[in-house]
Amino acid sequence: MKDIADISATMTELGKRARAAAAQLAFASAEAKRAALIGAADAVWARRGEIIAANARDLEFGRDKGLSPAMMDRLMLDEARIQGIVDGLRTVADQDDPVGEVLAEWDMPSGIHIQRVRTPLGVIGVIYESRPNVTADAGALCLKSGNAVILRGGSESFHSSGAIHACLVAGLRAAGLPEDAIQLVPTRDRAAVSELLTMTDYVDVIVPRGGKGLVGLVQREARVPVFAHLEGIVHIYIDKAADPEKALRVVMNAKTRRTGICGAAECLLIHKDIADNLGADLVRALIEAGVEVRAEGLPGSLAATEADWGKEYLDMIIAAKVVDDVDAAIAHIRQYGSNHTDCVITEDDAVAARFFERLDSAILMHNASTQFADGGEFGMGAEIGIATGKMHARGPVGAAQLTSFKYLVRGNGTTRA
């Protein structure tokens, strides 16, 4: 009980500091926030040796825990990935400041003038798993949008996240912004997660970024509002009017470019009229690339079971199924999908339009790799996750999605009749 009490006190203190920092960030200048992010980017690159050394400790921890190759890939940092973190910080720094943006304005016959203006949410709690770059992405986006943030990274990335967090704090310090604007939970103890989820006095929204287990835990236990990021059970429907070369290129990229990200394809749905030719070619190409294909009605593959539909592999495995038409594909996706990202490959615009109209995934694609399901690829610089719910934020959650709004009403001694 003593440990739990200590964690409770620690989390309460983080919450108090975050709330105080949020009050200052709400009116921080765009220039100061940009300077903090540029300073953080410079610090990340200057300290890349320290970050890689910290990451080596996490990789050893991951090996000892028996993490899967996909999880180890998510965890690993090298100079190229650190350069990606630096680039992401600089991109967010150079974006327009969303705070204070006038979303709409109008005059009323009564004589009042009304503006709807973007405002920060306040304090955001971000809970994520093994990918340490989320520390930088989440910290940057929350700062850009004028929010304080409490980061709770996965136990696997504890040391990497700490090293990156130190760089973010260095940027805040250099820019004269409150260092408590970006805080990292200083323990691996899971009790800290439970505390964070119930801190209604200090936290305005929780953003979970991870697998089904994490998101389910957050949705069950949270008393704070949640932006849900469900797993990416990503489908690609190959229509009978698909261009074979486009289909092959898109499918191979969507599955094999990086298997451990939420935009990786996990299930192919192939029109029955092309199953014996293009379908067989796709299966053959995937197998030759080292992908295990679990299929129904396609030669050369392993037999699929019911458990393969609706499964996020995050690995060199893909499910495949022959379907009658686009409506059968839509029905399958509705039953087994996660409303994350789904794609149609076709040259028939009517089929593409039907796919877009009849599905309600956060991201729908036509003749493009599902690996574009990423805030950076959407021009957001970085993302805090892909929101699959229908309230407030949906799709890639960038800085603008981490704001609310308020109404500014101006008169001239105006009174209501």
Swiss-Prot record:
Q: Does the keyword Membrane apply?
A: no
User: What GO terms describe the biological role, i.e. biological process, of this protein?
Assistant: L-proline biosynthetic process
Q: Which domain of life is it from?
A: Bacteria
Query: Where is this protein chiefly located?
Result: cytoplasm
Enumerate the GO terms in the molecular function aspect. glutamate-5-semialdehyde dehydrogenase activity; NADP binding
InterPro entries per UniProt:
Ald_DH/histidinol_DH (IPR016161), Ald_DH_C (IPR016163), Ald_DH_N (IPR016162), Aldehyde_DH_dom (IPR015590), G-glutamylP_reductase_CS (IPR020593), Glu-5-SA_DH (IPR012134), GPR_dom (IPR000965)
Give the pathway.
Answer: Amino-acid biosynthesis; L-proline biosynthesis; L-glutamate 5-semialdehyde from L-glutamate: step 2/2
Protein name per UniProt: Gamma-glutamyl phosphate reductase
The organism is Ruegeria pomeroyi (strain ATCC 700808 / DSM 15171 / DSS-3)
